[in-house]
Swiss-Prot record:
Co-chaperone required during spermatogenesis to repress transposable elements and prevent their mobilization, which is essential for the germline integrity. Acts via the piRNA metabolic process, which mediates the repression of transposable elements during meiosis by forming complexes composed of piRNAs and Piwi proteins and govern the methylation and subsequent repression of transposons. Acts as a co-chaperone via its interaction with HSP90 and is required for the piRNA amplification process, the secondary piRNA biogenesis. TPR repeats lie at residues 170-203, 218-251, 252-285. Pfam families: FKBP_C (PF00254). Interacts with HSP72/HSPA2 and CLTC. Interacts with GAPDH; leading to inhibit GAPDH catalytic activity. Interacts (via TPR repeats) with HSP90. It comes from the Eukaryota. This is Inactive peptidyl-prolyl cis-trans isomerase FKBP6. One of its GO terms (cellular component) is cytoplasm. It is found in: Cytoplasm, Cytosol; Nucleus. The gene is FKBP6.
Length: 326
């Protein structure tokens, strides 16, 4: 978000008795057609415009005129919540504004009361009939409607679409999973990854395009392996890690995940085999080398406990047995 004040110093009435918002509005673009929503781009974005049914990831701050501190902001959150247009966003002006934005864009908007809090406002925070200013940064957006509609089709219906469509929808599902994973919502992330995998499994591609499907599957297998580790289900993590290795037997990330899973299952020799192979591919990888150190430490503890248990068993047999005595 912009580190400067929202009005860039426009805090006093000018010679013509125009308010700061009136002065600011003179250089802003009308995107509603009635000057109810005005826009000033601070930083240009890139790519496509936000689609009407998208889920958006944004940072925003809302200001009242003559006030430097926002009355509403989500910038304090480490990871903003994903919001769906038409459902989670209550300001009409913000929705229209977002539809005019591209990924990475930072913009300033003025919303007239009709597009904000109406003639009544929102007491005591928002006075009646108030124009508000919002600074909005579009971090990312996902076209969830396209994905949801496609996933609702039967396998036969999906097969009528070109491969690129399937790959795009699968990628969207995976991106949703990644977002949920970053929110520590591992179960929900797993559901999205499995939806992506189902789409890719259903699709039969011609030989010259099969590598595209395999590449997409590899990413999902790696995501699922990591997610199951987070869910403390190492058997499933190992299964998906091994599926990734079928596609790319030297994939360091897949070898690493398999090693982690085996370590959690106390299968130390298998864990070592996977981790050594991973280290061979990426000898200076900090995570792999640390996992090998952890494995060595766990194995030492395991062997110490085994020796101690054996010692106690034999000691008990020598001192406490009466078998064969008269």
């Amino acid at each position: 978000m912009s580190s400067s004040r929202p009005l860039n110093g426009l805090s006093r009435l000018d010679a013509e008795d125009r308010s700061p918002y009136q002065r600011l509005s003179q250089r802003m673009l009308d995107i509603s057609g009635d000057r109810g929503v005005l826009k000033d781009v601070i930083r240009e974005g890139a790519g496509e415009l936000v689609t009407p049914d998208a889920s958006v990831l944004v940072k925003y701050s809302g200001y009242l005129e003559h006030m430097d501190k926002p009355f509403d902001s989500n910038c304090f959150r480490k990871t903003p919540r994903l919001m769906k247009l038409g459902e989670d966003i209550t300001l009409w002006g913000m929705e229209l504004g977002l539809l005019s934005m591209r990924r990475g864009e930072l913009a300033r908007f003025l919303f007239k009361p009709t597009y904000a809090y109406g003639t009544l406002g929102c007491p005591p925070l928002i006075p009646p009939n108030t124009t508000v200013l919002f600074e909005i940064e579009l971090l990312d957006f996902l076209d969830s409607a396209e994905s949801d509609k496609f996933c609702a089709l039967s396998a036969e219906q999906q097969s009528q679409f070109p491969l690129q469509k399937v790959l795009k929808v699968a990628a969207t599902e995976r991106e949703f999973g990644n977002y949920l994973f970053r929110q520590n919502r591992f179960y929900d992330a797993k559901v999205r990854y499995k939806r992506a995998l189902l789409l890719l499994h259903r699709r039969t591609a011609p030989p010259e395009e099969q590598h595209l499907v395999e590449t997409a599957k590899l990413l999902v297998f790696l995501n699922l392996s990591f997610t199951y580790l987070k869910l403390e289900r190492p058997t499933m993590a190992l299964r998906y890690g091994e599926q990734a290795l079928i596609i790319d037997r030297k994939n360091a990330k897949a070898l690493f995940r398999c090693g982690q899973a085996c370590l959690l299952m106390t299968e130390y020799q298998k864990a070592r085999d996977f981790l050594v192979r991973a280290q061979r591919e990426q000898p200076f990888n900090h995570d792999i080398n640390n996992e090998l150190k952890k494995l060595a430490s766990y194995y030492r503890d395991y062997m110490d406990k085994e020796r101690e248990m054996c010692h106690r068993m034999f000691a008990s047999g020598d001192n406490g047995s009466t078998v064969g005595e008269n």
